[in-house]
C-alpha cells in the first residue's frame, strides 16, 4: 500500500472513532496474507477484506501475554485429512470476534521458543472457536477485546512452518 495516503486516512478515521480505528488497523492482516500466503489463500481471503469482513491477529495468551515465544496454543496436523487443527486459548484479542484471524500457534511438538511457532489463517465460518469472554472496557467498545477458546478449529498454514513469530508476526506488527 502507498504508506502516506494510508496513514492520512487512518488518522482521519481515528479522530472519528477509536473502535473503528482499531478495526481499520487490523485490516493490515490482509497485507500479511498478500505477502506470505499461497495463491489459493490470497484468492479466498483478500476479496473478503474488500467486501467488509473483519480481521484479527490472535497472538496473546493467558500465560504468554506479550512474551510471544511462550505461546502454547497447539496446531496439530492431521495426516488423515491433510488439515491443521488449533486447540487452546487466546486472551486480550482485539476484534476477537472477527470473520478471519491470523493465529500464532505452536506447530512443533517439544519446542519452547519462537522457532516452534507457525502462523495460521482461521475462518470463523468453519467453527471450532468460541468467544468465552468479552472484556468490559471503559471505551473503544466498537472493537471487542475477547478471550477465545479453540477446540479442534480447522486452520490453514500461512507460508512455511516455524516462521510464525520470527518472520510473519514481525511483518504483521511492523
Can you say where each PLM-predicted feature lies in the sequence?
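Internal helix-loop-helix
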Residues: 1-51, 93-100
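Glycine- and acidic
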Residues: 10-15, 25-31, 56-58, 87, ...
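Flexible, glycine/threonine-enriched loop-and-boundary segments that flank and lead into catalytic domains
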Residues: 58-80, 85, 89-91, 96-100
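A short core secondary-structure module
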Residues: 83-129
